[in-house]
Amino acid sequence: KIKSVHKVVEKKPDVIRSPYRDKNYIIYIICVFLYAFTFFQLFTTQPVYFKRELNLAETSIGILMALNGLVITAFEMVIVHSIDGKRNTLQLISLGSVLLGLSYLIFNLFPGGFILALISTLICVVGEIFSLPFMNSHAMSRTNAHNRGQYAGLFTMAWAVAQVLGPAAGSQIAYNFGFATMWWIMGGTFLIAAIGFSYL
């Protein structure tokens, strides 16, 4: 009898790569931090700006903030599903960052009250839809089963630190130098993040 010999091929384990040695991921995390740093102005300094500088009533401010959530709820999944896998995620994140930057800079470019705030909010919503859903998925696309926790931890840390520093920095800039300066800085920071995302 001829015995067949089956050679057992062992699957090689995934290479365990540290996120701290992943140069492109570090650049990505820096861009995510810049994005989040400016993004949190939406919930802190922007409502104050609406009330003090645009003289909006609290009811109007509440309507604008609710509109943001309603539009995202209604359209985000449809839009994301239609473009997911068909476009480079980094380019989409970059586009979203540009739109968010414009939603801030518009305050320094045009006079206005509620209409200006409404236009800014709608631009902001589109920017969020094109960027936020893809950020975490892009980060996780660089991982394997062995280092996913490390990559996720660094990503979460970027958002957590930005949530602490962003609102504090924004309010201090607005208090000491005025809202116009604050919008130039925050809008410009969004554009810097957009350039970083597109570079990757």
Positions of predicted regions on the chain:
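Intracellular juxtamembrane helix-capping segments at the cytosolic ends
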Residues: F130-T143
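Pair of pore-lining "gating" transmembrane helices in MFS-fold secondary transporters
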Residues: R21-L42, L122
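Structural signature of the two symmetry-related core transmembrane helices
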Residues: Q91-I106
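Short amphipathic helix-loop junctions that connect adjacent transmembrane helices
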Residues: T44-L64
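Juxtamembrane intracellular "pre-TM" segments in multi-pass secondary transporters
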Residues: I2-C31
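A membrane-interface helix-boundary motif in multi-pass transporters
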Residues: Q172-F190
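Helix-to-loop junctions at the C-terminal end of transmembrane segments
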Residues: F75-N88, A174
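Helix-loop junctions at membrane interfaces in 12-TM secondary transporters
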Residues: N108-S120
